[in-house]
């Protein structure tokens, strides 16, 4: 407030000098960036994601609109039930190499490769369902529409304006793709 910190406290292993992964807070930043890009005409909210990322054309995301990604109203088979070892979230994070891959793993090796394996379940636009893959796909759309990486978009549109004392960091996969679904630190 008025240039001064009003309240600051650290719990557990967190310290003023330490890094803290923001996980799903990342989604809010990219929802905001997506809305900014719709407002300035860079993105068409009613266009299919595949307009910006042709690789998504034959995937479950192919006919999902930018608005449906922003609103998380895609009809996708993707569970984030963390108590279920077979939930799709685990394969998603394995693809990005956030978790060790089991011996013989032959699945997707990047976040974007994983998006191409997601199956459709129901219709897009019918109901909200919290699914990290929506924001990961949105990040890909944003990167393509702006010709800038996910990280550069965050830096330019939000981080540089926050007055943050330090740079932000991103979790990346094996090819250097930032995890828009939850990789901000």
Regions found by a protein language model. Name each.
Residues 4-9, 48-51, 85-123, 149-167:
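Short, charged, amphipathic alpha-helices and their helix-cap/turn boundaries
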Residues 3, 21-46, 69, 138-142:
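Active-site SXXK
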